[in-house]
Structures are given as structure tokens and as C-alpha cells.
């Protein structure tokens, strides 16, 4: 059981109750009921108030009479009740604040501090507001009950943890969030909010823009009408005062009052003009504040867009650099392959026992049978060379030339390829083939047929290569130049034909061979004509 110490008793002044005397009732135990304790406290407070003041016999008769008396309207009662309520609320707030720190101060000291604070705010209470005081006592008792319950819970917790001595009561820690994640969420949420606000503002401004001129005209018209009406009223007042002055000629005081009224009306007109101007200024300032807020939102939205643009631009630049590096590496690989192929071809041509490079010409589209024949011959040559590779046997470490590289890039050094092929044909066969073919020597007819076949193959391959060169050069060259040259040639041929037809001289029907050693087409075809006479035709 905890005892509540009260402050030293003081004599009541002017028949008022002592507010500093609190509810001196014991705290409830575990088996007690809250309602009974509250009723006991109220009864004890009533008894104390009746003993000290002697004016409580009316209030202790019945609670119904107390309620009826409290409901009666009275200005003094309302004022006193408001003061007591404020004091009680402040006291209860202080008690609640004190009950949260039971580990630092004992309960009695907190009660004393609460009563001292309530005594500083209001020290006297009227007899008519005693019902309010009882409500204040009930609130204090409830706060004391809460404080006692918290104290018991802390004591029970201390007793339970004492024998074990293993449990350590730690204060609850706040949940820690990741700063970066929270900042990113906040920034994204802020950006979304700013964007939504920007959309709302832009839509509102666009909608207001359509009716802005009409609204301005209407407001100006209403302002002008109000000013005109005010001026008319002021002029009417002045006229009435002027009509009143002759009636008040005998009375000096009335004349002075009329003059003062005239001056006040003039000042009123000036004040109305000033009020109108100040009102316009105030409206402009308010509109400027609203517009400044909207502009701030728009500026923030633009900054967000700039930040997003800078981020995406940086990502785009990085992607471009990565693509350029990949393109460079991809382009460098074919160049290296071409260099290796050239070196390998030169080494193969220099060494008679090494392998020879294989080239397959790409088939032209518009060449017809020539391209097909050349492609078939190249395929035959490739099959023969592959058989020679199988006979000779290649090393495992050597790489065979890739065919698709030569198919896709046939246009480079075709003449060198053909020359190397001719040299390779004219060169003696490797030692392996000589060792295989020593058993049987070819005859003279076989040699002639083989040389004829090789000559035909070389001619066809050279024609095909020339056609492919011509096609490639035509593709590379500017088509406009080719077209202009072709048009010029056609125009020259047409002009020569026309000049020959226009400026041709008339000749006799009989062909003559005087002074001309060249035989014309007429002289050749003249004997085959239908004219059968041998002499010249008649003139």
C-alpha cells in the first residue's frame, strides 16, 4: 500500500475550498474494483469539503440534486468551471507525464509536484462548481490507478528477474532500415508525386486559360460598378448634408456636426479608394504566391527530367562506346585473318611441298552460263586440290583456309590469285605426287590434251575473273558517271548518223570505181541484182 502525502493544510480564503488537497485514498489492490474505489474517493472528498467549509450540506443530499444544480445556467459557474477544468486538465496531464517515469522518482513526489502545479494555476474553487471538482478527483484517481498498475508491473518484473539473474531487460530498439533503399524509395515517390502535381497544375492552367479573358472582363466590370455605386452614394450623402445646412443656420452645434460629417464623407471616399487599391495588391500577392508554388513544382519536375536525361544520356554514351569497341574488335579480326591468309598463301607459293590456297569465285548474278561454268571449274579444282591434300597429309597444327572467308571476300587480289594459280600449275608437282606417278609416264597425246584442257580452263577462269572485276568496278564506281558517259556515246552516234544522212551527195545509179580502191557494198551486191544488162543504166 502506498500512501499519498498531501500538502500542509491552509485556511480557505473567502469560503473557497482548498484545491491543493488531493484525493487521499489508498491505491487499489489486486482484488479491489475500480468503481468502488472511485466512489469512496468521491465520498471522502465530499466529507472533507463539508467539514472544512460547512457549505456542503446541500450537495451531499443526493446526486440527482447535484446534477440539477450543475445544469442551471450561470455565468459565474461557467467561468469557475472552466478554470477548474483547465487546472484539472493540466494536473492530470502532469500526472500522466509523471507516471511514465516511475523508475526515476517515487510516486509521492510526483503527486506533490502535480498538486503544486495545480495550486499555482488555480488556488480557489467556488462552491457552485463542486461537481466539477468531484469529476477532477475522479480523473486524478484514475491516473493514480494507472500509475499504481504500472508500478506493480515493474515490481513484479523485478521480482521475476531477480532469482534467475539471466534475463536482461533491454529497451526496445527501433527498426533499422537501409538508408540507400529508403532514399531511393523516397526519391522515386517524390518524383512520382511531383509529376502528378505537375500534371494537375498543367491541366488546371490549361483549363483556366480558356476562360481567363472572360473572367478578367467580368471582374473589371463588377469592380467599376461597385466604385460607381459607392461614388453615387457619397454624392447623395453630400447633397443631403448641403440641404441640411440651411435648416441648421441658427444652431451652431448642428452646423459643426454637418461640417464634420462632410469631412468624414470625403475621408470615407478616399479610404474606399485606398482599400480598393490595397485589395487589388493583396489579390495580386496571393495569386503570385500560388503561381510561385506552381512554378516551384514545375521547376522541380524539370530538374527531375534533367536528372533523368543526364542519367539516360550517360548510359547511352557508355553503350555507344561499348558498341564501338565491339565493332573495332570485330573489324580487326577479319583484317588479321586476311593478313594471316596472305602470309600463308605467300609461304605456300614459295614452298613447293606446302599446301596451296583454295579460292572459289562468287557466282555473278547476270552472267549466265559463264559464271556457272567458272563456278563448276573452280569446284573441280577444289576437289582436285583436296584430294592432293589427302595424299600429302597435313600437319595437325596447321589450319586449313576457311572457304566462307574467300567466298565473301573474293574481290580482293583476284588477279594475284589467278597468277598464283597459273604459277602453281606451271610449277612442278610436289615430290609426293612425283613418287606416286613415277610408275607410269604420260604419253605425248595425253600431254597435249591436258595442256589444251588447262588452257581452256585458264581462259574460262580469266574471262570469268574479268567479268567479275568489271561488275565489281561498275558497282564501286558512281552510276551517274557511267550513265552520263553512255548517254554521251549514244548522242554522238545519233549525230553522226544524222549528219551522214543529211549531207550525203547524190551519185549515179551505176557503180563507178574511178579513183577509189575500196569496194563498197553496192559494188559487191550489184551483180546479184535483177537487172540483167551488162552496160550501164540509161541516164
Curated annotation (Swiss-Prot):
Belongs to the IRAG2 family. It is a single-pass type IV membrane protein. It is found in: Endoplasmic reticulum membrane; Nucleus envelope; Cytoplasm, Cytoskeleton, Microtubule organizing center, Centrosome; Cytoplasm, Cytoskeleton, Spindle pole. Residues 1-479 are cytoplasmic. Pfam families: MRVI1. It comes from Mus musculus. GO terms for cellular component: centrosome; chromosome; endoplasmic reticulum; endoplasmic reticulum membrane; nuclear envelope; spindle pole. Residues 1-21, 69-98, 147-171, 334-353, 418-449 are annotated as: Disordered. The chain crosses the membrane at residues 480-500. Interacts (via coiled-coil domain) with ITPR3. Interacts with SUN1 and SUN2. Interacts with microtubules. Interacts with HCN4; regulates HCN4 channel activity. Keywords: Chromosome, Coiled coil, Cytoplasm, Cytoskeleton, Endoplasmic reticulum, Fertilization, Immunity, Membrane, Nucleus, Phosphoprotein, Transmembrane, Transmembrane helix. The modification Phosphoserine is found at residues 347, 354, 408. This is Inositol 1,4,5-triphosphate receptor associated 2.
